[in-house]
């Protein structure tokens, strides 16, 4: 039976808050550049760390179907909700809710990339993460029976494909290109788990942990400083690929140090947020819209320049906390009644007199 690691819950919770902060109009700010350097790599690294390969005697088809239920089914559920929610928002704000809007939106949902194209619209861009993670897990599950050199060769071939796609302005459907770019991060997490790279820091002195944090933060700074502009796995924007991987891994390492320091602090809220990262990932853009309109209302009362205070790092932190707190009870409900919406495939809803271990 798997033992739940509390520091991983902290890592996922901090990671999802960084995602919200990054999407809160922080892309053109210096701290937004730092957040984008590692907030999505963190999730792929954590997933690799937690990954359990399918047993050799188990059907690979069953492994794929399990990941379809835990990632692709929620993708379409939240995707359809996003189309309807966006149409409703457009209706009340005077935007487009025509037949053409619906056709482009559903086409974008089927295409499965986290951005608009000439013929498609993606109403909820963070949803790209779900099909990308699906491909990463399916590829990793297939390669689990092969030796490391085969995995390295596949990662290298995938990165060559990404470079060619980027050079010629092409993309693969269902965020497969993003999956190829994220695959090395996934394997970095798997390697850290396999060789116990974090154990010395988890069981060692605090001074050693502080030293690792300082080195990781410094390497992250250098990576961002020398890698011009934002990196984005969604759009396969990497600028300098070596610096992208260096920044993603070092930034994640710094977060891990903080989370290992918090390992002794247990919280039902953090556990719930960790369980609900898929839901938060899928719905936070609408939370940002609600909070942003609330800020605009306050700014209108404050007068000219009233919005300046809300376009800042503290406002982004507060917004992330508000959205995660606002989704706490929906997550608790879904954990008991609708685990599919949390990506918990194969887990039965909890009835009276029953308990369920979060996983």
Which sequence ranges carry the predicted segments?
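Alpha-helical transmembrane segments and their immediate juxtamembrane cytosolic regions
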Residues: 1-359
């Amino acid at each position: 039976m798997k033992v739940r690691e509390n520091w991983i819950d902290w890592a996922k919770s901090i990671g999802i808050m960084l995602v919200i902060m990054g999407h809160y109009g922080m892309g053109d700010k210096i701290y937004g550049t730092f957040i984008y350097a590692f907030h999505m790599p963190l999730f792929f690294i954590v997933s690799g760390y937690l990954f359990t390969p399918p047993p050799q005697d188990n059907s690979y088809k069953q492994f794929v179907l399990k990941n379809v239920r835990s990632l692709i089914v929620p993708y379409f559920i939240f995707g359809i909700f996003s189309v309807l929610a966006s149409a409703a928002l457009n209706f009340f704000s005077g935007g487009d809710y025509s037949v053409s809007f619906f056709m482009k939106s559903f086409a974008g949902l089927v295409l499965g990339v986290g951005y608009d194209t000439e013929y498609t619209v993606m109403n909820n861009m963070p949803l790209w993460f779900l099909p990308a993670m699906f491909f990463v897990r399916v590829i990793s599950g297939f390669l689990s029976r092969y030796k490391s050199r085969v995995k390295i060769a596949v990662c290298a071939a995938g990165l060559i494909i990404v470079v060619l796609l980027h050079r010629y302005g092409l993309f693969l459907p269902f965020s497969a290109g993003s999956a190829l770019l994220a695959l090395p991060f996934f394997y970095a997490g798997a390697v850290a788990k396999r060789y116990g790279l974090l154990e010395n820091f988890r069981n060692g002195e605090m001074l050693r942990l502080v030293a690792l944090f300082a080195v990781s933060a410094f390497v992250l700074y250098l990576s961002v400083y020398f890698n011009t502009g934002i990196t984005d796995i969604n759009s396969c924007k990497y600028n300098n690929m070596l610096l992208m991987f260096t920044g993603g891994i070092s930034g994640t390492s710094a977060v891990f140090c903080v989370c290992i320091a918090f390992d002794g602090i247990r919280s039902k809220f953090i556990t719930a947020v960790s369980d609900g990262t898929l839901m938060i990932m899928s719905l936070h853009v609408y939370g940002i819209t609600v909070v942003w309109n609330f800020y605009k209302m306050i700014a209108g009362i404050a007068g000219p320049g009233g919005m300046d205070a809300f376009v800042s790092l503290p406002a982004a932190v507060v917004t992330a906390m508000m959205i995660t707190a606002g989704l706490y009870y929906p997550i608790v409900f879904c954990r008991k009644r609708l685990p599919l919406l949390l990506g918990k495939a194969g887990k039965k809803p909890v009835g009276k007199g029953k308990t369920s271990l979060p996983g």
